[in-house]
Each structure stands twice: as structure tokens, then as C-alpha cells.
């Protein structure tokens, strides 16, 4: 089993945690072939809902920046095409992978890849007491680290972190650096019916509850999750 010399490093910024509930706000990808960066991809994404304040503080991405950006369904095809058949790489790659698989399924597309998780490698090769977030790991391994919490710079940082760890630890650990099959189960989200929207609207009014996202931006699945609570 060989370590990967070619892959696509990916980082997403999102409105929160959980691919079934939250939305993508930014995509950054770095294509690496035979160890060298050959291409990059970057876009902001309109999540179709307000970005929470604490997320804006973390990422610097606000509603104004994304209001004219494409929706995820407009770019998921080119994201998949950019990746080709290469494995994907990221710091906690299942987070990003889950969002992309969900977006693909919603667009009646398939996105199935093997992947490399730099966070798992950090857990293997760093002392337990060391912080293992992307910035801390890059500092520990003397890998270049640009502005944290923007998608393209974080994707580049994950790539450089992988290369730095590989230089130090590849010998005898080939299997740890090899891409593994990623599995994320996603179901296509149903379009919300007018009846569902009205039912939720009436429920919220009756219970005097305010939603943080517009009802019109919610899928049928999301409305069901709220009304079932």
C-alpha cells in the first residue's frame, strides 16, 4: 500500500457542523500531482440562509460576501470534475467529504472517493498533549501556514502538513499515509411542499418560536426534523 503522491486537498467553510443541517459557504481545493501543486480551485458559495455571527467571527465570511456567489448546486459539478479520480485529503476529511457527498446526492450526482485524513496522522505522530488543529499541527511540523479559516489557504496548509509528516515518518508507516475508502451515507433531500412550509409556519406562530433560517431555504427533510421535535 503506497502513500499518495497525487491527491486533491480540500477545505470547506460552512454555516456550522453537520452536512444534513448546515450549508457550504466556501470551497478551496489544491490539486497535487506527483507531489507538486498543479492547480487550485476557489469559490464562495451562497448558503441561501444567514451565516451565524460566531461563524463570521471565525471565518471572516459574512452575508454580504456570499450574496452574489453561486449556490452549491451550481458548482458541485465542477468541484467533482476538478477532483477527477484522485483521492481527497483534508484535516478531518470526513467533515468536508460529508458536505460534498450530500451536495452531490442532492444534485443527482455521485461523489465517491478514497481519502487521507491529516488529523488521524497527527494523532499517530504527535505527542498526546500537543494540540492537533490545523494551525497547531502546521507549527509543530514546521509546515507553512497561511491565514487560518479560509478555505484555499487551509487546503494548501493540509497539503503542506501531509508532505511534512511524510518526510519525517513515511519509512515503516506506508500504510498510515495511504488513502482509505471514505464512506458517508447521504439521502437526497426532498423539496419542501407548500403544505409543509405552512404547517411549520403555523406551529412556530402557535408556540411563539423564532427560526434562525428562512423557511423557504429549508428542505422537506429539515422541516420534518423541526416539526417532529
Residue ranges, per PLM feature:
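Acidic, divalent-metal-coordinating active-site segment for phosphoryl/phosphodiester hydrolysis
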Residues: 150-163
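Acidic two-metal-ion nuclease catalytic site recognized across multiple nuclease folds
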Residues: 162-229
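Short, glycine/acidic-enriched loop or turn micro-motifs at the edges of active sites
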Residues: 14-16, 120, 157
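A short, structured active-site edge motif that brings together acidic residues
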Residues: 113-125
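Conserved non-catalytic scaffold segment of RNase H-like nuclease domains
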Residues: 1-113, 127-149
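Active-site catalytic microenvironments for nucleophilic, acid-base chemistry
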Residues: 103-106, 124, 140, 164-168, ...
Amino acid at each position: 500500500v503506497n502513500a499518495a503522491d497525487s491527491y486533491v486537498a480540500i477545505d470547506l467553510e460552512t454555516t456550522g457542523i453537520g452536512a444534513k443541517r448546515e450549508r457550504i459557504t466556501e470551497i478551496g481545493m489544491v490539486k497535487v500531482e506527483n507531489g507538486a501543486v498543479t492547480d487550485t480551485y476557489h469559490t464562495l458559495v451562497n448558503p441561501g440562509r444567514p451565516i451565524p455571527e460566531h461563524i463570521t467571527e471565525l471565518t471572516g465570511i459574512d452575508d454580504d460576501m456570499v450574496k452574489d456567489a453561486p449556490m452549491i448546486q451550481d458548482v458541485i459539478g465542477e468541484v467533482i470534475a476538478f477532483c477527477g479520480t484522485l483521492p481527497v485529503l483534508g484535516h478531518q476529511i470526513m467533515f468536508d467529504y460529508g458536505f460534498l457527498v450530500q451536495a452531490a446526492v442532492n444534485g443527482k450526482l455521485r461523489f465517491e472517493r478514497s481519502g487521507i485524513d491529516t488529523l488521524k496522522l497527527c494523532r499517530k505522530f504527535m505527542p498526546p498533549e500537543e494540540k492537533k488543529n490545523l494551525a497547531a499541527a502546521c507549527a509543530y511540523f514546521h509546515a507553512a501556514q497561511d491565514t487560518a479559516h479560509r478555505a484555499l489557504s487551509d487546503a494548501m496548509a493540509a497539503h503542506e502538513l501531509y508532505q511534512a509528516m511524510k518526510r519525517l515518518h513515511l519509512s515503516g508507516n506506508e500504510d498510515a499515509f495511504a488513502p482509505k475508502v471514505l464512506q458517508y451515507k447521504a439521502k437526497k433531500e426532498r423539496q419542501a411542499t407548500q403544505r409543509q412550509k405552512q404547517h411549520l409556519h403555523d406551529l412556530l406562530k402557535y408556540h411563539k418560536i423564532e427560526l434562525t433560517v428562512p423557511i423557504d431555504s429549508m428542505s422537506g427533510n429539515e422541516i420534518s426534523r423541526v416539526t417532529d421535535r
